[in-house]
């Protein structure tokens, strides 16, 4: 089997893994925002055995792709394959009017979750943005949601008001109301998300006539996991596993 380098480039972080035969080895993620990507690649990839193929899910930032393409060409004489969402793949049918406009990270995560579950799933990616995607038992993508992540919610509040920026940490949801500014902000964000997820699960039970299994991934997944009204499965490598699935069928 070919040695695959799988790469997930989000708005803030880069994650990667090597898949060789049946072995899947994921590296620790790195923050790329504010850094020279080529320097990070030197540190992480400069010492590894060259892959046979590179499969990438990436946000649409041309400068990042250009740096990555140049690095792969210089060091390995390889041209990466960038995942583009399609109408149908690996048993999942895309709900978007224009299939290619669905984020490739969302598509990869959906493919991996449905492949693992072989049934209805709700995929929640908790990164810079929070995305939600739902797939039926038959593999039909019902659509999704996009909203600001927890840090984005905090940042917009500080930018649009006279509140002084402070580091906001999650507060135990033992009460609805806070008694200081920090707790008021933290509880406001958490209860907003919690209410959304409760409403979402109620809707999906009616729409699907079953309760889908929720898969969580992304940097804030563990912080958000407790806000879900039903059992969840946390998988930090969901996008990378989706890329591996696509690569195995390429």
Task: Enumerate the language-model features and the residues they cover.
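Glycine-rich phosphate-binding/hydrolytic loop that grips phosphoryl groups
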Residues: 162, 232-250
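Gly/Thr-rich phosphate-binding beta-strand-loop-beta motif of the actin/hexokinase/Hsp70
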Residues: 1-24, 113, 117-141, 157, ...
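Conserved phosphate-binding catalytic cores of ATP/NTP-utilizing and phosphoryl-transfer enzymes
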Residues: 1, 90-121, 242-250
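Adenine-nucleotide phosphate-binding core of ATP-dependent small-molecule kinases
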Residues: 28, 173-213, 231
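Glycine-rich phosphate-binding loops at beta-strand->alpha-helix junctions
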Residues: 13, 57-64, 211-227
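Glycine-rich phosphate-binding loop plus the immediately following alpha-helix
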Residues: 102, 111, 115-118, 142-186, ...
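N-terminal glycine/serine-rich phosphate-binding loop of ATP-dependent small-molecule kinases
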Residues: 1-89
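Active-site regions of enzymes building and remodeling cell-envelope glycoconjugates
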Residues: 78, 97-99, 229-236
């Amino acid at each position: 089997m070919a040695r695959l380098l799988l790469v997930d480039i989000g708005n803030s972080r880069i994650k990667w893994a090597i898949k060789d035969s049946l072995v899947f080895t994921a590296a620790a993620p790195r923050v790329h925002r504010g850094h020279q990507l080529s320097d990070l690649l030197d540190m992480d990839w400069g010492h590894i055995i060259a892959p046979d193929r590179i499969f990438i899910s990436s946000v649409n930032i041309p400068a990042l792709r250009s740096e990555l393409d140049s690095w792969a060409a210089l060091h390995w004489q390889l041209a990466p394959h960038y995942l583009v969402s399609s109408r149908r793949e690996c048993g999942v049918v895309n709900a978007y009017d224009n299939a290619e406009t669905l984020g490739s990270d969302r598509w990869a995560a959906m493919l991996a979750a449905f492949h693992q579950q072989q049934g209805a799933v709700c995929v929640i990616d908790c990164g810079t943005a929070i995305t939600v995607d739902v797939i039926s038992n038959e593999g039909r993508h019902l659509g999704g949601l996009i909203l600001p992540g927890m840090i984005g919610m905090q940042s917009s509040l500080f930018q649009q008001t006279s509140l002084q920026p402070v580091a906001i940490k999650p507060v135990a949801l033992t009460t609805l109301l806070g008694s200081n500014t920090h707790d008021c902000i933290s509880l406001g964000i958490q209860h907003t998300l919690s209410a959304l997820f409760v409403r979402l699960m109620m809707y999906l039970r009616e729409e699907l006539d079953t309760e889908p299994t929720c898969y969580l991934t992304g940097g804030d997944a563990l912080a958000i996991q407790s806000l879900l009204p039903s059992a969840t499965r946390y998988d930090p490598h969901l996008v990378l596993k989706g890329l591996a699935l696509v690569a195995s069928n390429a």
